Every structure is written in structure tokens, then in C-alpha cells.
């Protein structure tokens, strides 16, 4: 599998360059997906022909509906093979496209827009995205899009990106399904620009009670509620890990520590320097910023460096938490 999806456009809380070996190993374990697959009578999946360490088997394009006119969600990264594949597939099935919905601005989702307009000029004014580019139409929260056999409702889910939208497929008599974009992946977990918004979006997705997930990358998520529990647990565990480390540090009489020092406190000193600096530190910084917004941690600037501390320890309001008991130190601001 060629690494056509190996672009370096990545969110600030994660630098995948530091995880090339790990990502390469994960790719080898991914299930193979067909280029074109009719997942249900209403959902056709076409691979973006851009497989890679960050795009997995490639970006999924979804063709939605049962009639001649249908919706498309996401357009791949602009690969010529994708343009040929989608053109041949739609022609063979007698399908035309009414509207194109983009989950967010990242290039592996929007790169094929120009090819679609070249192939189908009538689509020029029917490209929809939250925070639209010039010539595109806006997608707003709870907006609905209808074609024969399918009604899709937009759900604003910022975090992975500020403009990120998921889409709920609402059809009577079928399990509720959601197109989850890059917020929830078919394999592994996603990256984010803002962890606080991302966590809110995870809860929002959970509240929709959809059973099936169609991600922008990877296989169908057959049990979306279970996947949501796992995602929320994973992020919450990271918060507890940070709080426990800060509490332990304070209990030893230390005042505060930098993000770099906190990463060493959590993961030890033997980490690869590149992994620590370009992957773990940006992510832990996102966790700290969320916890600061929640009133659970604070920081001071000393010698030009931001140094973090746990609020309760600095205020002397409770005893140090025992290892693994981070819940004892969670106090609202």
C-alpha cells in the first residue's frame, strides 16, 4: 500500500512524524477494504485512493440515497485515481450528485472538490461546508439535506477542527447511523485542535444515540455506543493521569512544573526526545489547558516558562491523593 496519505497536515496536539514507525506497524494490521462497497441500500462507500499512515486505507467518500440524485460526503485528497473511480462508479449506477457535504477543511477531505466540479459543472454552487470557502454554501448545526431514500441532519462537532461536522442518517425502520468524519475513526483514536471542544463533541455524539458509525477513515463502526464509551474513557483517563502526577509532585513539596517536566513525571525520563517533544508534550499541553478551563489546574510564569500546578494542592484544601485516586482531587472552580 503506497503512502499517498502521508501528508504532514496535522493538528497542533499531535505530530505524527514522531510516530512513523508505530503508524507504519498499525497500517500493516488494518483490514483491507474494497475500493467500492455498497454498505447498505442507502450508503455506498468509495475509497479516496490515498492510503497512508494518517489516512489508513484512504479517505472514505460516502454516496447517500436510493434514487438517481444523491448526496456525497467528503471528496478525498484530490487523487486522479479517485476522480476516475467515482466518475466510473456513478455512471455505471446511473447516479447524479445533488449536493456535496464536507465534514471539515482538511485537504484529505476537500481535495477532490475541484475534480467533482470539473466532472459535474452543475455542482459548482452545491458544495457545502461549515465556515465555507469562497463559492461554497454554509452548513449550520441541525440543517437537513434530503434526497430520495435519505435524510441527513448536520451536527456541529468542533474539536478535531473548529468547523467539523458530523451527519446523522435518519430513516425510519433502520438503526440510526452517523457519519462521524474525523472525530471518531474506524480504527484507533483521532487528533484534535482543542481538547475541551473535542470532549464536548464526544458527549454530543453519544447523546444522539446512533447505533452505527461511518467514519471518514477505516471500517464501519458496528457498535458506535461502545466506541464512544471507549473514547470518553481514554480521554478521561489521560486527565486523571495528569491530575495524579501533579498531585504527586505537589505532595513532595514541589510547587509547579513545566509541560516537559510533567511528561517526564508521567512517562519517565527514558522517552525518545522526538516523541516527547513533538507528540506527548503537545497533547499533554491540550489536557492541561482543558483542566485549566475546568478550574482544576492553574499555572504561573517563571523565568519565561509556564509552570502548572494542581489548584487544590496550592490552596491546601485537601490531602494529597493516593496513586490512582485522582477523583479525590477533582473540585469545581
Swiss-Prot record:
Its EC number is 3.1.2.-. It holds the Pfam family Lactamase_B. Zn(2+) 1 binds at residues 104, 106. The active site is at 108 (proton donor/acceptor). InterPro entries: LACTB2-like_MBL-fold, Metallo-B-lactamas, RibonucZ/Hydroxyglut_hydro, Sec-metab_biosynth-thioest, WH-like_DNA-bd_sf. Its cofactor is Zn(2+). Gene3D superfamilies: Ribonuclease Z/Hydroxyacylglutathione hydrolase-like, Winged helix-like DNA-binding domain superfamily/Winged helix DNA-binding domain. Keywords: Hydrolase, Metal-binding, Zinc. Binds 2 Zn(2+) ions per subunit. One of its GO terms (molecular function) is metal ion binding. GO terms for biological process: secondary metabolite biosynthetic process. Pathway: Pigment biosynthesis. Zn(2+) 2 binds at residues 108-109. Induction: Expression is down-regulated during biotrophic growth within tomato leaves. The expression is induced at later stages of infection when conidiophores emerge from the plant and produce conidia. It catalyses: atrochrysone carboxyl-[ACP] + H2O = atrochrysone carboxylate + holo-[ACP] + H(+). It comes from the Eukaryota. The keyword Hydrolase applies. Belongs to the metallo-beta-lactamase superfamily. Atrochrysone carboxyl ACP thioesterase; part of the gene cluster that mediates the biosynthesis of the bianthraquinone cladofulvin, a conidial pigment not required for virulence but that plays a role in fitness and resistance to environmental stresses including UV light and low-temperature stress. The pathway begins with the synthesis of atrochrysone thioester by the polyketide synthase (PKS) claG. The atrochrysone carboxyl ACP thioesterase claF then breaks the thioester bond and releases the atrochrysone carboxylic acid from claG. This is Atrochrysone carboxyl ACP thioesterase.
